[in-house]
Regions:
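Beta-strand-turn-beta hairpins that frame and shape the catalytic cleft
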Residues: 1-4, 108-114, 177-183
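N-terminal active-site segment of His-dependent metallophosphoesterases
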Residues: 1-57
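Active-site neighborhood of phospho(di)ester-bond hydrolases with catalytic His/Asp-centered motifs
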Residues: 6-7, 32-37, 58-63, 115, ...
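Active-site environment of divalent metal-dependent phosphoester hydrolases
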Residues: 10-15, 40-42, 64-69, 120-122, ...
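Short beta-strand scaffold segments in enzyme catalytic cores
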Residues: 106-109, 153-157, 200-204
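Anionic-ligand binding region
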Residues: 130-174, 179-183
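Acidic, His/Gly-rich catalytic cores of divalent-metal-dependent hydrolytic chemistry
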Residues: 160-244
């Protein structure tokens, strides 16, 4: 069975639609695994929640998902993120809030552990360095862990001797899952930060034991126009053009 792995949609409906359309063009998908932050930053939180809920999916909670419903404090958010969160909170329906509040922090699925930030601190921790990755391997029992939060597609590998290495998860690269334990980040659908503005997602094939990363162009200008219309911070608008 094949599963689509998506993350950090961030209320970017045009990007989510482009990714879901791209997924349907490929072989049959058994479901969608979402790594959180469905909302925040972007202009269409309700629509993204609704569209995701129409798919056969599982999803963990992200920090923006919980912040928008008052489950976590936004004092650590930068001013633009906090402003977008405040706006997002006003857009959500009661049904949206119930759905978001019900999202688990961690999901174990097959050989994978799913978390938004890290298995050690699912909501807040970024896995950006080899040292942080090495420490986190002790916090999940499965062979592989899927994370997001940094919006950058990367792979951390834990060797048998306790060593840890890092590599970029390149577009169209097939990652063969073997005996080595891995922490894998598929990048972001709605706000990439690796210098490539295209939406990012991956597909896992449970039969071949491979994960492949894909990039999908979408109508960035349409999302930006919606953000300006909703008076969201201009810095958030501009960064979509550059994938930063």
């Amino acid at each position: 069975m094949r599963y689509a792995i998506i993350a950090d949609i961030h209320a970017n409906l045009a990007a989510l639609m482009a990714v879901l359309t791209d997924i349907t063009k490929r072989e049959e998908i058994g479901g969608v695994w979402c790594l959180g932050d469905i909302i925040g930053y972007g202009p269409d939180p309700r629509q993204c929640i609704e569209l995701l809920r129409r798919t056969n999916h599982i999803c963990v909670a992200g920090n923006h998902d919980l912040a928008a419903i008052g489950e976590i404090d936004t004092s650590d958010f930068n001013p633009d993120a906090a402003a977008a969160c405040e706006w997002t909170a006003k857009q959500l329906t009661a049904q949206d809030r119930v759905y978001l509040k019900g999202l688990p922090l961690v999901i174990e699925k097959d050989d994978f552990t799913l978390a938004h930030g890290s298995p050690r601190q699912p909501i807040w921790e970024y896995i950006l360095s080899i040292s942080t990755a090495r420490e986190n391997f002790a916090y999940f029992k499965s062979k592989f862990c899927l994370v997001s939060h940094s919006h950058v597609p990367v792979i951390f590998k834990y060797g048998k001797t306790g060593s840890c290495s890092f590599s970029q998860f390149s577009t169209n690269k097939e990652l063969v899952l073997g005996e080595e334990r891995l922490i894998i980040n598929p990048g972001a659908v709605g706000q990439p930060r690796d210098g490539d503005p295209r939406a990012s997602y991956a597909i896992y094939d449970s039969e071949t034991k491979k994960i492949k990363l894909y990039r999908v162009p979408y109508d960035i200008a349409a999302t930006q126009a919606r953000m300006v219309e909703q008076r969201l911070p201009l810095r958030l608008v501009g960064r979509l053009s550059h994938g930063i």
